Structures are given as structure tokens and as C-alpha cells.
UniProtKB/Swiss-Prot annotation:
Keywords: Signal. The keyword Signal applies. Residues 1-22 form the signal peptide. Adheres to biotinylated epithelial (Vero cell) proteins. GO terms for cellular component: cell outer membrane. It comes from Rickettsia prowazekii (strain Madrid E). This is Putative adhesin RP828.
């Protein structure tokens, strides 16, 4: 948690520096909120070898930002992903499970704090097209279930999360813009730990969480 607070302070300092650099320009702050649908990349369960697939998850972000120039902006966002799982019922391939069918589920809890930057590539009469990226700390843990004797919860791990984004935005009222965006986010791996299963030590956890996100957002000038 201390790492998260330290990196958050650094992120806020960077954002503040960007604002100071642009004070001579007539810009404004904005608040933002985003939500949508996400799917995690396929991953393999370490204990059983079963390749897991994602169900749909809901990414949510809240943040505050600043228009540095007409085509450049930066913001600080606090986000999470709700309801997603990596799961599957299939044939195990690892030792201790070979030849058996098992059900495996990994449910993550992710909290990320990102400092993001965006550049408008083109500006049309009705909408803008932009690209951007973000980086910051993420707290990642997971609940593992399915195989009797292997169910467990991993503790929070602090990772460096990064994000790539491409989208379009349009102004719908004075100081209000909406956007539709695709983003790819890498939140890193969870902690690994060993559990005893039928007299043997079996490694679980260590799942990497990368997601493809389609979101709708709104920015309010303040």
C-alpha cells in the first residue's frame, strides 16, 4: 500500500508539472468517468495446465484531467475491473492431475492508478480521433477456485500497469465531450504460492491479467 501511495504522489506531481507548464494557455480542468466491457487474454492455470478463457467484465474509471493545449491533454484516473473471471472445465495436463477433467476459476481484483496522456490526431467538424497511453501502479490479487484442495486467495501484489488507447470524441454541449475508445491494459501478474495437494507441493497463482476494453466515457469541464 505504501508503494501505491508513493507512486500516486509521483503521478500527481507529474500532472501538476504539466499544468504549470501550460498555465499561459487558456485551458481548463475536466472530470471524467468511463465504463464499458472488457475481456481478459487467455491464460494457463499453473497448477493444472488448463487453458482458461475470459467471461465479460466491466471496466470503470474515474479521473481528473487538464487540457494542456488544444490537441493535448493529460489526466489521472483511478480504475477497476468488475466481474471478470478466467475459467474453464477441461482436461488437466500437469502432474498430479493428468488424465482428469477439472473445473478451474480465477477471479481477479484489480485497482489501478494511472497517469495518462492523449493527443488528437485529427479534428473534424463533428468529432476528433485520438491516441494515448498511461502508466501507474496497480494492486492485483485473485480468488482461485474449482479444484478441491487448491482453492485459495492470493494477497495483493503491487505491479506497474500500463495502457494503450485509441478512440474518438465529440462535443455534445458546452464543456461536455463524450468518447468511444478501445484500450489494451496490462496489470501484471498475481502472487504465486504453494499449497499441499495429496502430499505434494503444487504452485498456484501467478496469473497475468491483460485486458481488451471497449468503453464509453464523458468529460465535464470544470
Amino acid at each position: 500500500m505504501k508503494k501505491l501511495l508513493l507512486i500516486a504522489t509521483a503521478s500527481a506531481t507529474i500532472l501538476s508539472s504539466s499544468v504549470s507548464f501550460a498555465e499561459c494557455i487558456d485551458n481548463e480542468w475536466y472530470l471524467r468517468a468511463d465504463a464499458g466491457v472488457a475481456m481478459f487474454n487467455k491464460e494457463q492455470d499453473k497448477a493444472t495446465g488448463v487453458k482458461l478463457k475470459s467471461n465479460k467484465a466491466i471496466p470503470i474509471d474515474l479521473g481528473i484531467g487538464y487540457y494542456i493545449s488544444e490537441n493535448v491533454r493529460a489526466d489521472l484516473t483511478l480504475g477497476t475491473t468488475i466481474g471478470g473471471k478466467l475459467k474453464k472445465y477441461g482436461a488437466a495436463t500437469n502432474t498430479h492431475f493428468t488424465g482428469t477433467n477439472v473445473s478451474v476459476s480465477h477471479k481477479p481484483t484489480v485497482t489501478r492508478l494511472l497517469i495518462n496522456g492523449y493527443v488528437d490526431l485529427t479534428s473534424f467538424d463533428m468529432f476528433d480521433v485520438f491516441v494515448g497511453g498511461g502508466v501507474g501502479p496497480a494492486l492485483v490479487k485473485e480468488k482461485i477456485s474449482g479444484v478441491s484442495g487448491l482453492a485459495s486467495n492470493t494477497k495483493n501484489k503491487t505491479n506497474v500497469s500500463y495502457k494503450l488507447i485509441f478512440g474518438t470524441s465529440a462535443q455534445i454541449a458546452d464543456g461536455v465531450k463524450v468518447e468511444l475508445a478501445y484500450s489494451w491494459i496490462n496489470d501484471g501478474k498475481t502472487k504465486t504460492h504453494n499449497v499441499m495437494y495429496k502430499g505434494a507441493s503444487v504452485q498456484t497463482g501467478g496469473m497475468r491479467y491483460q485486458s481488451h476494453n471497449l468503453t464509453v466515457g464523458v468529460r465535464f469541464g470544470i
